[in-house]
Regions:
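Intrinsically disordered, low-complexity segments enriched in polar/charged residues with Gly/Pro
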Residues: 12-15, 87-90, 100-102, 154-156, ...
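Short, surface-exposed recognition loops or helix-turn segments adjacent to catalytic cores
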Residues: 8-14, 279-280
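Conserved catalytic core of nucleic-acid polymerases
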Residues: 118-121, 128-132, 140-329
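Metal-dependent DNA phosphodiester-chemistry modules and their immediately adjacent helices/loops
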Residues: 1-9
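Common nucleic-acid-contacting/processivity interface regions adjacent to the catalytic cores
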Residues: 16-133, 209-265, 269, 288, ...
């Protein structure tokens, strides 16, 4: 904002401030309110919270609770299909389950590091494996592990989806969680495209009225797509919470371990590709990885491509941007 709170450091405490300089104390509080109002104009956080509450049909304070928000969203979805939600059962989270994959960073100083992340990883895993309370089978796969799946030691020929923790899910019906994930993701995609289009049009606006209208469109569409993004990303937090009506450790671990498979598979493929391009053997170009992101050392790649040629930072950035979009993505 380029602004800050009014200074009152000469007073020992707020009581001293209040009693010694009443007029300045009033101005201080008015300025604080104006700062909050300016922050809201710029950040739209209150508007975002209202959007989330309205969309999920919850009270405003409930948007800070993943469990309550998702419980209400699922209730509304199932009610619309004439499905009665199950009663809440008290559960204890005595057993720990595996979390996300984090690769120990390779220490060093690197030039030309790029990062990639898997788009909405956990929601997509829920859709990919049809992870949902009513699709989970009682029978577990006897030998499924992250390493065995990555090493292709297991074949999946059955009529169910198999996750890395051995949890198996029906294929003959589509679970309500994957359906909701798909709908929310599709809606987010639509409004994100509208936001980007409005931003593009804003750059070409010629009148104050047009500029104001487009600014409102950007804010509106951004709030809607951001609300959908938060809903998607908070789903796993609810699924792994023992107080969630649909909590099941198998579902939570199916998501995290399948996420490990995905990010490690991407890591292996990136290393294999760069080893082939640079004619190296078993070199590790992924210097760090965490949950759904990898950090790739493209310094050797840049050195090989620009060897003996004049180069500038701008030309390298432009080249890497194109290569990352065309080859790696």
């Amino acid at each position: 904002l380029g602004d800050k709170k009014l200074d009152h450091s000469e007073f020992e405490n707020f009581k001293d401030f209040y009693t010694s300089d009443w007029q300045r104390f009033v101005e201080y509080n008015i300025h604080d309110v104006n700062l909050v109002d300016s922050l809201e104009d710029k950040m739209k956080l209150i508007e975002l919270a209202v959007t989330m509450a309205y969309d999920a049909k919850v009270n405003l304070e409930d948007v800070y609770s993943q469990v309550r928000m998702w419980d209400t969203m699922i209730f509304s979805d199932l009610k619309g299909r004439n499905i009665v939600v199950p009663p809440r059962i008290t559960t204890k989270k005595d057993d720990k389950y595996a979390g996300a994959y984090v690769k120990e960073p390779i220490p060093g100083s690197y030039d030309w590091v790029v990062s990639f992340d898997l788009n909405s990883l956990y929601p997509h895993l829920i859709m990919q494996y049809n992870i949902s309370p009513e699709t989970l089978l009682d029978e577990r796969h006897p030998s499924a592990t992250v390493d065995r799946i990555l090493d292709e030691e297991i074949t999946f020929d059955g009529d169910c989806c198999v996750c890395a923790n051995g949890a198996q899910y029906r294929k003959d019906i589509l679970g309500f969680l994957p359906q909701m994930m798909q709908r929310i993701y599709d809606e987010r995609t639509i409004y994100k495209k509208r936001m980007l289009a409005a931003k593009q049009n804003l750059e070409d606006a010629t009148t104050p009225a047009e500029t104001l209208a487009l600014q409102k469109d950007v804010s509106k569409f951004n709030n809607i797509q951001m609300a959908r993004k938060i809903q998607l990303n908070s789903a796993y937090g609810a699924i792994g919470n023992q107080y969630f009506r649909y909590y099941n450790l198998a579902n939570a671990e199916a998501i995290t371990l399948s996420g490990q498979v995905s990010i490690r598979w991407i890591q292996n493929k990136m290393n294999a590709y760069l080893n082939k391009i640079l004619r190296t053997t078993d070199a590790d170009y992924v210097i760090a990885a965490d949950t759904d992101s990898i950090y790739l050392n493209l310094g050797p790649f840049v050195h090989e491509v620009f060897k003996g040629r004049e180069k500038s930072d701008e030309s390298i950035v432009g080249f890497l941007d194109k290569v990352c979009q065309v080859e790696f993505e």
